[in-house]
Amino acid sequence: LAEQYARRKGGRCFVSGSTRDIFQGYAGEHSVILDELRPKSIPYADLLRLTDPFAIGHEVMAPSRYSDKPVAANLIVITSPYSPYEFFYEQGNNADTDGFDQLERRLAAVIEMQQREICLCQYAGNGWYLPMPDYTRPNPYSRFARGDDSSVDPAEVYESVLGTSADSSD
């Protein structure tokens, strides 16, 4: 969904890679997806700099393993199993210096992918995001919606790896 949206907004997009260097391979794309972002993947100060809407006038640098890279993105989509508040909290930030409100005001929308629904959420305070009732749709991407029961049978995997007892001559 994030990639579809980014492509509709601006053609080519960059999807982050390894947690050791999330901007590895970035080549100036104007749409960036920070996919499955975790609190330890990027320092909070760098995330604030990347998402600063007023930083477009001056060069924003993304942290990268060997040398930082200039970012020319006008769209940044973040996917994460963490809510924005959980992400902030898990980083162990000093709320007096870099408070959560700095991140919250940079977010145009917080969309939660639930098993059955996709919800636009609103920050309700005290770390809670609540779905907005008029902005909820069925989630066609979930296993539930697709009827995908791709659960794995451990015994089947075991037999596949080791072979049947008749094949044990290897």
Where are these regions (language model features)?
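Glycine-rich phosphate-binding P-loop
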Residues: 1-8
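Short, flexible loop segments at the rims of nucleotide/cofactor-binding pockets, characterized by
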Residues: 9-13, 54-56
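Short beta-strand-centered segment that lines the nucleotide-binding/catalytic pocket of NTP-utilizing
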Residues: 11-23
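Short basic/glycine-enriched coil/helix segment immediately N-terminal to the Walker B
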Residues: 25-29
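Walker B catalytic acidic pair
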Residues: 36-37
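The feature encodes the CheY-like receiver
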Residues: 40
